Amino acid sequence: MLLRFPTSYFEGMADMNTDREVIEGALALIEADGGWTQGAYYRDADGTQVHPAVDSPGHWVRVRTEHVGAGGYRTHTEPVAAPCSFCLGGALRAAAGYWHSGHPYAAQQQVDRLESLLLRQANSADAMNWPDLHAFNDDAHTTAADAVLLLKHAAAAYACER
């Protein structure tokens, strides 16, 4: 039996979105009314943080913690609709298919690279020097318009490469 291994890291990953597609996908998520949030990667319509369902790709859950007395707590999950608001990192992950991709490590590398690009743009456009994209996203002075503008600048940079 002859085994053939990929000749490059990205061979066979044709189902992955390009960097430009991920940026544009993240922009579409953030640009929607109420599509941007600070803090959590993903939030539902009630503003509660949601997580991808580990055992059911494409589905989302909300984690509930209940006090059961005498210092005890019980945690359970409940299914919810797809998230409707995203932080910048969450929007990139969603657009890259990070949580439901067949290639999570490649998607993570792509997200890391795009977060680095956005951070460089954010730091060059302002007097601030944020250590990471989360710090920019969660800064009290950052607005939804700032997040949209940052993604539009990145999309324009990729459009110029064509």
Residue ranges of model-derived segments:
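Domain-length accessory/inserted modules outside core catalytic folds
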Residues: 1-162
